[in-house]
């Protein structure tokens, strides 16, 4: 019997793979998220590898796996640490978050959980509220005062590109595809 011990913030499962994410909020300048990949085998579920990216994820919809590439969207908070930076996570150091320096990123990782493509620094000062992956497209909604919807083409995993940005009032916490090229935001 084998076990993998640790913390899990989110889980993404499909018929092609199982992924667990764990965000490290320790005293660093920014959060880091570790992703643990598991494969389905004749013996059951087996650990394959892990990777790490900057930031934290909103929920399981911030992750997707197409059978070859794992895609994930994160928000990165720039943090200022004052006091004893060597203290424990709940020790005497003070951490403040600079929302003006907050950015949002989308990463594409290969089967060994290494970053092969990325879009970084979207919507400075905002945070991700919802993400939806549909085929080779990613839809990312961020929020602070307006509600930008980013459309990202993932056709070339090594060179994902922002194809459009729509700014509308409010924000959507859930995106649902209803037809080719149409989304409903709730």
Describe the function of each predicted region.
Residues 1-186:
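Beta-sheet-rich non-transmembrane sensory/scaffold domains
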């Amino acid at each position: 019997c084998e076990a993998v011990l640790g913390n899990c913030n989110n889980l993404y499962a499909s018929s092609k793979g199982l992924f667990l994410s764990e965000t490290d909020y320790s005293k660093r300048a920014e959060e880091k998220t570790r992703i643990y990949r598991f494969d389905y085998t004749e013996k059951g579920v087996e650990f394959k590898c892990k990777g790490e990216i900057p930031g934290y994820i909103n929920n399981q919809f911030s992750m997707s796996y197409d059978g070859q590439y794992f895609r994930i969207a994160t928000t990165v908070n720039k943090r200022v640490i004052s006091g004893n930076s060597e203290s424990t996570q709940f020790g005497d150091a003070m951490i403040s978050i600079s929302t003006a320096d907050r950015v949002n990123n989308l990463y594409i990782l290969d089967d060994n959980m290494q970053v092969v493509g990325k879009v970084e620094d979207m919507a400075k000062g905002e945070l991700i509220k919802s993400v939806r992956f549909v085929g080779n497209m990613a839809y990312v909604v961020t929020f602070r005062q307006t509600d930008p919807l980013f459309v990202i083409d993932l056709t070339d995993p090594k060179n994902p590109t922002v194809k459009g940005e729509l700014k509308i009032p409010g924000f959507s916490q859930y995106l649902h595809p209803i037809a080719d090229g149409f989304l409903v935001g709730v």
